[in-house]
């Protein structure tokens, strides 16, 4: 009887610890999201992510993957490429591999490494084909937009792109999509709407390296949008 009681007590304590730790992890993820996307504070985000709480709940590979968005805001291209090389060389579950390919498509397009972008896009399509859920389809669609905008300059998707940007709740990503729509207006030789969307994107991207870049375009030459 004593052994049964001990087993029940150990099981009960284990369950309490499991739910407590799970709640702490969820709370940390909410905290990190608010720091990065509401406060737009990538430096603080990385400090918390790589602090004791981040190390407690996330593996080194996961933390590297989670760091990419913050490093994008800081325009730390060398660090991002280093992370991509490290993560491409290790085994990851399909979900993380999908997230990595998504970030690679975006990054390599932004840095005009189009061969690498198309390679990552092919990888993304292969992984996405193994899933059957709306979230994965949304990720694939977003990356298809990037390929069509930056590599093929396809202005036919402009209305769809603007509709997607309007539905986004995250100001950082909304700003990025508005900026990309501005590019398409430039490719259509519509400078008025190009400038208008650059202004809107700048407001959404306050406090980031993107804001500085867009401000320079508006002050010097909106045609720079075609190159960046």
Predicted features and spans:
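Extracytoplasmic/periplasmic C-terminal soluble domains
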Residues: 141-228
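Residue at a conserved register position within TPR or TPR-like alpha-solenoid repeats
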Residues: 35-36, 71, 108, 148, ...
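Boundary/linker segments of alpha-helical solenoid repeat arrays
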Residues: 57-61, 92-98, 128-137, 169-175, ...
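Structural register within alpha-helical repeat arrays
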Residues: 31-32, 67, 104, 144, ...
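N-terminal signal-anchor transmembrane alpha helix of single-pass membrane proteins
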Residues: 1-29
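Structural motif corresponding to the intra-repeat A-B loop/turn of tetratricopeptide repeats
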Residues: 39, 74, 111, 148-152, ...
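Acidic, Ser/Thr-rich low-complexity segments on the non-lumenal side of membrane proteins
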Residues: 44-75
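Alpha-helical repeat scaffolds
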Residues: 43-52, 77-89, 113-129, 153-168, ...
